[in-house]
Amino acid sequence: YLLSVYLFCLLPKLQAQDIDFPLSLSEIEKYESRIRIQRLPAVTITHADAYKIRTRQPVYSPRTKEIVLDIINMDGPTAELEYHNLKQMVNGKWLGFPFIDNLVFAIGGRDLSKGDTLPEHIRMSEFKYPLKPNRYQANFYVFANIHTYCNLTGKSIVSIKETEMDGAFAFKVLPSNNDSIRILFENHTNLEVQPVFFPSISTDERYMVHPFARSGWVGEANYMKSRARLKGGEAILFTIPVSWDVNRITDRNDKKRFQAGRLLSGKYRIGLQLEIYMDTEFEVK
């Protein structure tokens, strides 16, 4: 269980050269010139608890060695279980309940499909301090990869309707002229949702066909955290031009690869990575 490193511990160690991306770090970080992000008015909450967590009992003893959470996919897309943490109530505020130093976790590898319930074990040996009589909050998130398709022609960009996502999350390409791909994501749950990076643009045969789309760079993830975290009932629109300035690409091979300077007519796969956050409370008496 305690084998590898938290995702958030891994990300800061990434170097620009570790990312299979055609732009230099300085160009990656020109976020506003790559993609436009627009937050939209509230949407209807139709799937309030698409994912839920609950403790198996509401009250625990200070001598408790392990707390088991049930992670439930009520009505959301398949998601991968990630990691937990605890908070404690201090003077009317939720404050972090610290882990022991240098604690590492094995995460990932457990998929939660619609209708499934999976356990998450919280071992008190992971934390610096024992439980004391108080109120506590358990926090957890799951990771989902969603996608949809569109067709780009010489005159327009049209969504492929049968690939559009609806339900807990709506994800689709809006019809537009052929100058920009407009990607709509709507959160119809009452949960907070974080798009991790910019949307990706690929084909069924080739990943990453647009040099200004998703980079995977930690700075891009931090940029998204500051601008694109959505509360329940919020939505966001991404606008990505179909053309790019080849001169912003420095590597000779990458410049040749993207020398057309624009997406050609064809079918494109649009992807988005999501973190979906949940919490539940329990007491220690």
Segments predicted by a language model, with ranges:
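A generic structural signal for short beta-strands and their flanking turns/coil linkers
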Residues: I67, E82-H84, L118, N134, ...
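Primarily secretory-pathway and cell-envelope proteins
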Residues: D18-I100, Y141-G232, R257-Q259, L272-K285
